A protein has these predicted regions:
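OB-fold and OB-like single-stranded nucleic-acid-recognition modules
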Residues: 25-262
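Bacterial N-terminal signal peptides that target proteins for export
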Residues: 2-12
Length: 262
């Protein structure tokens, strides 16, 4: 995460956002889909440098927001290690974003790449794109976002969990310390320092291996055993509860029923 970036805060329009709604919002990881690759994150610089390759394709991208333009537009940063330019995103999802001046994370966007023409985009999506900034992106690739979700690094969450409690999140990282009963940890790839994020699966559980790269979709909670057992119907006997509670009580925990393998 860039510490000098303008912050973003993602606020869901629909109140009482559940994990079931979250899974529907971000889409499925299996099945036919007109996209570049279901299980691949695409670099924004790769899209701007090779736009013809991506026009008409669905993509999954993750990066910092540089600027918000009105109610629908935003500029997503380019990747630091790859050539290319920032990319325009038109947000057609049911999630709004606003900028503050705090230090906050990337966002994960799912959408389709089109060639930007202000007039045609306004007509096609019934929009009124008033800002002059849009003129800078005429003829360039634009992502029409169908879903948008906060995607902080694991270490950002464990360092400042209060910012993220009870928010839907999509966390990218490597699987670590896989335990029984649907518990594992996730850490930032190639990161040094910082505390790993605890994850608890409920419902059907994905089989995981150490060092797999994944995106985990879920809601951040404080680890309070009684609440987790009640809210997610976790099948843990008393001895397991005692062991887990001793290790993780009051820590932030991401509760998930959706894991995407990259």
């Amino acid at each position: 995460m860039r510490l000098d970036k303008l912050a973003i805060k993602v606020a869901t329009i629909v109140a009482g956002f559940t994990l079931t709604q979250l899974s529907a919002c971000v889409g499925n990881t299996t099945g036919d889909r007109d996209n570049y690759s279901v299980n691949t994150l695409v670099d924004t610089g790769e899209i701007t440098e090779n736009s013809d390759r991506f026009i008409g394709k669905s993509v999954l991208i993750r990066n910092d927001v540089l600027q918000i333009i009105g109610n629908r537009g935003l500029i997503l940063d380019k990747d630091r290690l790859i050539d290319g330019e920032p990319i325009l995103v038109i947000n057609m999802s049911e999630t709004s974003i606003e900028i503050s001046h705090d230090k906050t994370p990337e966002i994960l966007i799912d959408g389709k790449v089109e060639r930007f023409s202000k007039n045609s985009i306004e007509q096609k999506y019934d929009l009124n794109l008033e800002s002059e900034i849009y003129g800078q992106y005429e003829g360039k690739p634009v992502i029409i976002a169908t879903s948008l979700i906060m995607s902080p690094d694991p270490e950002d969450i464990t360092a400042n969990p209060e910012i993220y409690y009870n928010r839907p999140l999509a966390i990218k990282g490597e699987v670590d310390d896989v335990e029984d009963y649907g518990i594992f940890e996730i850490d930032e790839e190639k990161a040094f320092g910082g505390e790993d994020l605890l994850v608890v699966q409920f419902g059907s559980q994905a089989a995981l291996n150490e060092e797999q790269t994944v995106i985990v979709y879920g809601v951040l909670r404080k680890f309070v055993m009684k609440e987790l057992l009640q809210d997610y119907d976790l099948d843990w006997d008393s001895s397991i509860q005692t062991q887990i509670e001793a290790e993780h009580q009051q820590k932030p925990v991401l509760v998930t029923n959706k894991i995407q393998f990259l």
